[in-house]
Regions:
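Generic detector of short, locally flexible boundary/turn motifs and exposed helical patches
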Residues: 19-23, 50-55, 86-91, 114-120, ...
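Active-site core of metal-dependent hydrolases
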Residues: 108-169
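Alpha-helical scaffold segments that flank or form the walls of functional sites
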Residues: 2-56, 68-80, 100-111
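Active-site gating/metal-coordination segments in enzymes
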Residues: 64-121, 153-155
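Aromatic-enriched hydrophobic runs in primary sequence
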Residues: 12, 44-48, 61-64, 86, ...
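Active-site-proximal loop/turn and secondary-structure-junction residues that shape catalytic pockets
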Residues: 30-32, 60-63, 89-91, 128-130, ...
Length: 169
């Protein structure tokens, strides 16, 4: 987020080993342009080949999602390492998906998780914008989509919302 020279370098296996980490889930952040789900999957496969357990998420902060197969559901269904999707909400760097787009996305993730037997998570980078995770809590309250598919992050600045979300299930 400061030019090409500030790009985050690729993760190194030695960092996991020296930290005692045995399982990783890789994901893309803001930069879904110079990095891609394909490159992330290649790194995930390399880590698995090096002896650590590694999974990854398709997409980055953006909506519509950038995938390998053309759909989030197919990425989850047909690529063993992919267990869900990354997305940003409530952030100046997000694509501001609508409620209906979020419902459609998490529904696709849910169906893929049911068919594949995978967890099927929507990993949500939550920024500092005022709406916070209210759109997600509204979806949980007003649909039959289980809360277990939503994984919001960066909630330290939103402790009351985090508490409400936790009590929802």
């Amino acid at each position: 987020e400061g030019g090409f020279e500030t790009r985050t370098p690729e993760f190194q296996l030695s960092k996991a080993v020296t930290s005692g980490v045995t399982t990783l889930v890789g994901l893309l952040g803001t930069d879904g342009y110079t990095k891609s789900p394909e490159l992330l999957l290649a790194k995930t496969k390399a880590l698995n080949n090096e002896g650590i357990t590694a999974y990854c998420l398709t997409n980055s902060y953006a909506y519509p999602p950038r995938t390998i197969t053309g759909s989030v559901a197919n990425d989850i269904l047909y690529i063993s390492e992919i267990i869900g999707c990354k997305l940003a909400i409530a952030d100046h760097r997000c694509s501001h998906p609508t409620r209906d787009e979020l419902i459609r996305l998490v529904s696709d993730i849910r169906m893929a998780s049911l068919v594949s037997g995978k967890v099927g998570e929507l990993h949500l980078h939550v920024g500092a914008s005022p709406e916070g995770i209210e759109p997600i809590m509204d979806i949980v309250r007003t649909t039959d989509i289980p809360i277990s598919h939503f994984r919001p992050t960066h909630l330290g600045r939103r402790l009351e919302e985090a508490s409400q979300f936790t009590h929802m299930g």
